[in-house]
């Protein structure tokens, strides 16, 4: 008998991609101790953004379990639009930092 596992669809924060689905996801070893949901903005591999950062590395594309884990991170858009309300933080500073990566929060 087959086992069916329900999984959450990744990248629920995406609104629109320019053309095809050519998003720059990179595998990053994230060392934040706690679990983080998809859509968390990362200041760096060890820190979730708090809203005041001038630069970020990207947005988690997958849920990250507790402890160190290698996960997909959206590090650059093509350009791409993301849903600001679905991100962990969407202050003006974070929106500006994401725009520098061609990721536009709407």
Predicted regions, residues:
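Surface-exposed, low-hydrophobicity beta-strand/loop segments enriched in small/polar/acidic residues
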Residues: 1-106
């Amino acid at each position: 008998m087959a086992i069916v596992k329900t999984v959450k669809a990744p990248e629920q924060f995406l609104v629109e991609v320019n053309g095809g689905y050519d998003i720059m996801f990179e595998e990053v070893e994230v060392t934040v101790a706690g679990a983080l949901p998809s859509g968390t903005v990362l200041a760096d591999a060890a820190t979730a953004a708090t809203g005041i950062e001038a630069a970020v590395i990207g947005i988690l594309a997958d849920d990250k379990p507790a402890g160190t884990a290698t996960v997909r991170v959206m590090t650059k858009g093509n350009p791409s639009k993301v849903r600001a309300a679905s991100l962990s933080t969407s202050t003006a500073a974070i929106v500006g930092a994401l725009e520098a990566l061609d990721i536009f929060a709407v």
